[in-house]
Amino acid sequence: MKAGIELISHSQASHATYANSMTLAEKGPQRLKRQFKEHSSSKESNVSRWLKIFIRQFDIWFPETIPTMKVRYELLRKNFIKEIFNSRAFIYPFLGFYEVLTNPVYWKHILLFAVCYALIFVTIAGLFYVTLVPLLVTWAILLLGPLGVILVHIQWILQTNVLTAFVCRTLVLTHITNQIFDISLVLQDQDEFLNEVKVLPKPQKPHRKIDEPDAVRNFNTIKGSRIFKIPRLLFRMFFKVSNFTSLTLLSLIPIVGPILANQLMAPKRTFTYLQRYFLLKGFSKKQAKDFQYEHYASFICFGMSAGLLELIPFFTIVTISSNTVGAAKWCTSLLKGERKKE
């Protein structure tokens, strides 16, 4: 009898031990899951805390960046779809081309432009032929055989033309293009606008207020120091070099590369052609960029049409001038629209 009772109690104890072990086994994964959730939530809280600190410091040192990005995003969101279907900016380069061919007043400037263009083209073509063409020829012969030599030389002419157009438009011949722009405005009865803007005093930078607190004055002094400007200059330089390098590598693709690079530069090309308009209107760099984002679809349309006209080798001598006239025609349309609103 006692043996039976001991056997029953022993079985009950083992059953209880098994139940406790099963309970602990069931609670183990739950405890691990709970600890993992707590750990992940603590990591998320640390990341969010550091992110908030970074955003706060970014707002302190770059107070205008985030608001400017928000404003430009809203301008894109409101106007892009509407302008992409309604904009007539793509037609102005062709109108300018027709006017340049039919109006002799531009021919003297085009002749001077042609001489400068020829010198720059020969220089860039020689450098390009000595440095990159041998490598491209070797690669093309291995892949395409004798046909590769012909394609490389076509690529050499297209690439040289693209670089020459870029140098002429942005670095060397801006004075000639500014004269062509002003002549076109006068021919379109905008001489009153030119006379007004040329006699207006240049805007001066606002002076510091006398009652400005010392802490604010010291902070602004730190922000305006050269040490603070170095990181921003390095970032901008890195961005420009990366952009230029990527476009250059893209343009090395036979035949198709220069066309793609030409079209990808459409907004930048339009901004370059309208720089004279921004100067005459007295726009700051920020205002000019805001104008670009407000009419970004029109910038793309104008830049693509102007780029196609610039793409034909040696034809660029005429088309850079005609695109400048087209930009002046577009600006005349904008000025007339502003007067109607007034």
UniProtKB/Swiss-Prot annotation:
InterPro entries: Spore_wall_assembly. It comes from the Eukaryota. Residues 1-109, 153-240, 321-342 are cytoplasmic. Disruption phenotype: A combined deletion of the LDS proteins RRT8, LDS1 and LDS2 fails to incorporate dityrosine and another yet uncharacterized component in the outer spore wall. It is a multi-pass membrane protein. One of its GO terms (cellular component) is prospore membrane. One of its GO terms (biological process) is ascospore wall assembly. It is found in: Prospore membrane; Lipid droplet; Spore wall. Keywords: Lipid droplet, Membrane, Sporulation, Transmembrane, Transmembrane helix. Its main location: membrane. The chain crosses the membrane at residues 110-130, 132-152, 241-261, 300-320. Residues 131, 262-299 are extracellular. The keyword Protein transport does not apply. Involved in spore wall assembly. May be involved in the modulation of rDNA transcription. Belongs to the LDS family. This is Outer spore wall protein RRT8. It comes from Saccharomyces cerevisiae (strain ATCC 204508 / S288c).
